[in-house]
């Protein structure tokens, strides 16, 4: 069975993002899977585990590769991706050591795009190789770290694009797109027009319906 992971640390993302991702994966991945979130938050209906590292921001993803975390075939999605198509094509990538999309920006921060990752589990090289805080101070982010660590020794995942580069100016969804990654602004829930808005409407509804304690969304998101 495949484990699908996300990471929710800090306060950047509303808890509704976890539920929206969980449901999008459920609707678009036909193989048996378990959805898990690395977080310290209470998220009713979501299987959670405490972060194995105390790193903040994108560095928290290093914890995915700690021993006893991902022990079998694994997929990972950033919370701010929007799933637009079937995900079954990603399953074979979980049988290899590591796979991710190529970085479409290539802005000098590495050629790996870590918004979607697949690996076989029990692969600890990033965790074992990361030197905190030295690496976090000299490198721009986890993508640059993975690029430095792996070079070209990884498989490229197709079907993942940038909302800014591949979606925002298009009048319809690109036929190749399965996952849209958001970076910078807007965040997915801030997209209220165009074809992308149909994929973000549920997320917006959950955010607007959430009570001050943040957990009314659980009653409508556990199905």
Regions flagged by a language model, labelled:
Residues 121-223:
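Catalytic core and acceptor-binding pocket of nucleotide-sugar-dependent glycosyltransferases
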Residues 30-32, 43, 93-94, 151, ...:
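Short, well-ordered coil/turn elements that cap or connect secondary structure elements
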Residues 31, 61, 112-115, 142, ...:
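Residues that flank catalytic or metal-binding motifs in active/ligand-binding sites
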Residues 1-57, 70, 184-187, 204:
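N-terminal anchoring/stem segment of glycosyltransferases
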Residues 23, 63, 144:
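Active-site phosphate/pyrophosphate- and oxyanion-stabilizing loops and adjacent acidic/basic residues
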Residues 35-44, 83-88, 123, 143, ...:
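Short, polar loop motifs at secondary-structure junctions
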Residues 43-52, 59-111, 118-122:
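GT-A fold catalytic core of metal-dependent nucleotide-sugar glycosyltransferases
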Residues 30-40, 74-77, 81, 97-100, ...:
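Short, hydrophobic beta-strand segments that form beta-sheet elements in well-ordered domains
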């Amino acid at each position: 069975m495949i484990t699908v992971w996300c990471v929710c640390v800090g306060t950047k993302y509303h808890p509704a993002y976890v539920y929206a991702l969980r449901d999008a994966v459920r609707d678009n991945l036909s193989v048996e899977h378990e959805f898990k979130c690395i977080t310290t938050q209470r998220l009713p209906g979501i299987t959670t585990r405490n972060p194995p590292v105390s790193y903040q921001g994108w560095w928290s993803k290093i914890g995915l590769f700690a021993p006893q975390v991902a022990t079998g075939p694994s997929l990972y999605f950033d919370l701010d991706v929007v799933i637009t198509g079937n995900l079954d094509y990603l399953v074979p990538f979980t049988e290899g050591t590591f796979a991710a999309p190529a970085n479409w920006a290539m802005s000098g921060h590495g050629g790996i795009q870590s918004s979607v990752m697949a690996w076989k589990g029990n692969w600890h090289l990033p965790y074992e190789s990361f030197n905190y805080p030295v690496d976090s101070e000299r490198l721009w982010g986890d993508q640059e770290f993975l690029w430095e660590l792996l070079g070209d020794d990884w498989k490229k995942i197709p079907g993942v694009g940038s909302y800014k580069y591949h979606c925002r100016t298009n009048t319809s969804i690109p036929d190749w797109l399965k996952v849209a990654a958001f970076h910078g602004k807007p965040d997915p829930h801030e997209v209220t027009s165009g074809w992308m808005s149909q994929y973000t409407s549920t997320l917006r509804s959950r955010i607007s319906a959430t009570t001050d304690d943040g957990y009314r969304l659980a009653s409508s998101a556990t199905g």
